[in-house]
Amino acid sequence: MRSLTRRTLTALTATAVVALLGTACTGQSPSGSDGSDSGKDVTITFWHGWSQDNEVKAIKANVAAFEKLHPNIHVNVVGNISDDKSEQALRAGGSDAPDVVSSFTTDNVGKFCSANVWADLNPLLRKDNIDPAATFPAPMLNYSQFHGNQCSLPLLGDAYGLYYNKTAFAAAGITAPPKTFSEFAADAVKLTVPDGAGYKQLGFMPTFHGYETLPAHYLGQYGSTYFGPDGKSNIASDPTVAAMFTWQKDLIAKLGGYDRLERYRSGFGDEFSAKNPFETGQVAMSLDGEWRTAALADDHVSFDWATAPFPVPDDQAATYGRGYQTGTIIGIAKSSSKQTAAWEFVKYLTTNTDAVVSFANAIHNVPSTLAALASPAVIADPAFKTFLDIAKNPNSSTTPASINGGAYQLSIQNFGYDFEAGRATDLQAGLRATAQEIDTAIDQAK
């Protein structure tokens, strides 16, 4: 999966969230066993969002392998389905609704679970003696449930790390990737080559508009929790949040200032193309996901490159190796009358080691079970292994689910835009106001 974080967050609206919460509960309850466990022929419908040729081919291969194991269960696969379309179908219910749905948007798990449109899988996991905590990496398990409701399971993951231009490193006299933020800042400055009012090469683009340099991705290096035990936003009281904003703004100043950086950023090409600024050499270091390794190999860039975990705060140096994680989720429609067959399919895709590994290898994503991460069948060159190690790291984290999706992240991001640009100058006051905004929005969504 490629990262959809920015476009997903910017698409969030309170109206859409309220509409989902207000209408989703009209779906019918499941009718129990569909007879598939006794050999009855059953056809289930699976909606997913993948569209690229290698992705579609990989899905078809996994479905064929499943149908070979379960000859009486047939899977009708429908691809390139957006979250909006699947949400509408699940709200409406009926015979045209899918039985199994996948989503690239882990931010939506909270509303999927709380709106009762995806079935709680806990009873099915218990029935088949599957211990989720012993099966899935902790961050992936965390982003697939909400308040104990395991309404989805991880189906491959994404991990974020550091990409660095080894050729540029050598020219700057840097012999190893940075591990702490102070080392990172020093290297970013060394790697920056000014050119008039712009740059011939920038060490790193730190602004929040810089593709994957979102507040949530930076905060993953701090282990920020976003909410306290009472469910209220803790971004104003958690010192790691203020520390991140202070660090990011300081790095902006060291690299030439916000206006100069934003002018340079305006010349960047599309993130998911060979015009990506890391691929063109416009930036020497980049924060990105595991999928970039395949793109760099396919695009035959003109320099040597490597990957490493993204640096961590100096006072958390022992956590080096951690990273932010997200991924794809899959669940069963609460309204489906074929949940027995649907569960067999979901269980196969998410817990069968061969299925997880083959799918991960085919689309170059991180495997989403502990067994698959440890499998020797995973195709992992040194660059990709970095992301497998990040996924295994006990300090890696994700953004928690919320009843109104990723709206709280959007609030933090919007404040970040104002703070980095100098439109907001009082950090603590801004964080307090943002926390209040988050709490109010969550209360309204309940």
What kind of feature is each model-predicted range?
Residues N122-F136, D195-P206, S224-M244, D298-H300, ...:
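Short, solvent-exposed loop/beta-turn-alpha elements that line the ligand-binding surface or hinge
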Residues A172, A253-D259, A297-A362:
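Extracytoplasmic/periplasmic substrate-recognition and gating elements
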Residues A138-P139, A360-A407:
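Long, aromatic- and glycine/proline-rich binding clefts that accommodate carbohydrate-like moieties
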Residues F146-L155, Y160, S182-A242:
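Extracytoplasmic/periplasmic solute-binding protein
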Residues R2-K111, A115, K127-P132, F268, ...:
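Conserved N-terminal structural module of periplasmic/extracytoplasmic solute-binding proteins
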Residues K385-Q436:
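C-terminal capping/gating helix-and-loop segments adjacent to ligand/active sites or protein-protein/ligand interfaces
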Residues A188-V189, S233-S266:
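Glycine-centered hinge/linker elements that transmit conformational signals in sensory
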Residues F104-A159, L219:
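Hinge/lid segment of periplasmic solute-binding proteins
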